[in-house]
From Swiss-Prot:
One of its GO terms (molecular function) is transmembrane transporter activity. Part of the binding-protein-dependent transport system for D-xylose. Probably responsible for the translocation of the substrate across the membrane. It is a multi-pass membrane protein. Coiled coil: none annotated. This is Xylose transport system permease protein XylH. It is found in: Cell inner membrane. Residues 46-64, 124-135, 197-214, 261-287, 334-336, 387-393 are cytoplasmic. It comes from Escherichia coli (strain K12). The chain crosses the membrane at residues 25-45, 65-85, 103-123, 136-156, 176-196, 215-235, 240-260, 288-308, 313-333, 337-357, 366-386. GO terms for biological process: D-ribose transmembrane transport; D-xylose metabolic process; D-xylose transmembrane transport. GO terms for cellular component: ATP-binding cassette (ABC) transporter complex, substrate-binding subunit-containing; membrane; plasma membrane. It comes from the Bacteria. Belongs to the binding-protein-dependent transport system permease family. AraH/RbsC subfamily.
Length: 393
């Protein structure tokens, strides 16, 4: 079924000010922002302010990093109208391989990273080859991968935990940026963002297209600067910006660019929106799907490196049901399981919501079974709201 042309989540305030501007703001983004604010206020109140302490915010963002990186890869798979149930087991396997290379084989860190990333690409491409060229449903292919990858992990580790990782390996998931470095990177990123925003506005004006009012652009940029610099300042009050958070930010920006500014990204949306129309328009569907799964494998490899580094070990149970968290993050972020609709920014925001709930309920000592029930209910509510919104529109 053909779908409307999707676009990456925009946090922009529309051209007109006040309430009329809010009307054209993407409803899903507005709901997610409201949900994040509500979650933060609730847990801040129930924990007497400890939830927004510098230490806990740092831990929260580190929790978000792994699921967020998985969601960056998963969102493209789902947009292409496919699914990947193997990412949890694949992450455990790749993290286990990294730990074996580091602990048992004593390889230097650069070689360990390269081998892990290449293996992630190959495993993702393996899934993609079966889906794209052998026409096996992705649900079956990745379900088989989930079982096989877990079995391989248990086999190569002999069912034991591979530890401890080296100090160099631990830097990936446990290190923090110096305070000055965090502010410099944040300032450079904001400068690039401001320049990109004004460049886009001037190009639209030159083409005679409607462009946002200058006051709206300045307001959006000021709000972004306050949020970014405020977050860096808060994180520096503890130990600094965690390295996994920096990696997630870079992958988020790269994913957003690929989704909105490249022909490859547009092909992914076209395939998910209407497969036959995409094929008739000249898109190489098989090659595109293969590339999507390979990219997903690369994201899983990065997440696996961070996980093993953060744990200081490779565990046979690592990554268990992580694929469900990644899928839930994408769905909560507005990605349609039917394909053709979704955004990288929304998926990462969904991952942040999931991590916020985990973190807050853990601080409140909520029993584990209730945590699963709450997350399941929120996932169901998010899908229902998305379906209800589409029916009304």
């Amino acid at each position: 079924m053909s779908k409307s042309n999707p676009s990456e989540v925009k946090l922009a305030v529309p051209t007109s000010g006040g309430f009329s501007g809010l009307k054209s703001l993407n409803l899903q983004v507005f709901v997610m922002i409201a949900a994040i604010i509500a979650i933060m206020l609730f847990f801040t109140w129930t924990t007497d302010g400890a939830y927004l302490s510098a230490r806990n915010v740092s831990n929260l963002l580190r929790q978000t990093a792994i699921t967020g990186i998985l969601a960056v890869g998963m969102v493209f798979v789902i947009i292409s109208a496919e699914i990947d149930l193997s990412v949890g087991s694949m992450m455990g396997l790749l993290g286990g391989v990294a730990a074996i290379c580091d602990v048992w084989l004593g390889w230097p860190l650069p070689l360990t990273i390269i081998v892990t990333l290449v293996l992630g690409l190959l495993l993702g491409a393996w899934n993609g080859w079966w889906v794209a060229y052998r026409k096996v449903p992705s649900f079956i292919v990745t379900l088989a991968g989930m079982l096989a990858f877990r079995g391989i992990l248990i086999g190569i580790t002999n069912g034991t935990t591979v530890s401890p990782t080296s100090a160099a390996m631990s830097q990936i998931g446990q290190s923090y940026l110096p305070a000055s470095t965090g502010f410099i990177i944040g300032a450079l990123g904001l400068m690039a963002f401001v320049g990109w925003q004004w460049r886009g506005r001037m190009r639209r004006q030159a083409l005679g297209l409607q462009s946002p009012a200058s006051t709206a652009v300045v307001g959006r940029q000021a709000l972004t600067a306050i949020i970014v610099l405020g977050a860096i300042w808060l994180l520096n009050d503890y130990r600094g910006v965690p390295t996994p958070v920096l990696l997630l930010t870079l992958l988020l920006l790269g994913g957003m660019f690929m989704a909105t500014r490249t022909a490859f990204g547009r092909r992914i949306y076209a395939i998910g929106g209407n497969l036959e129309a995409a094929r008739l328009s000249g898109i190489n569907v098989e090659r595109t799907k293969l590339a999507v799964f390979a990219i997903n494998g690369l994201m899983v490899a990065i997440a696996g490196l961070i996980l093993s580094s953060r744990l200081g070990a490779g565990s046979p149970s690592a990554g268990n049901i992580a694929e469900l968290d990644a899928i839930a993050a994408c769905v909560i972020g507005g990605t349609s399981l039917a394909g053709g609709v979704g955004s990288v920014a929304g998926a990462v925001m969904g991952a942040f919501i999931m991590a916020s709930l985990d973190n807050g309920m853990s601080m409140m000592d909520v029993p584990t079974f209730w945590q699963y029930i709450v997350k399941g209910a929120i996932l169901l509510l998010a899908v229902w709201m998305d379906s209800a919104t589409k029916r009304r529109s």
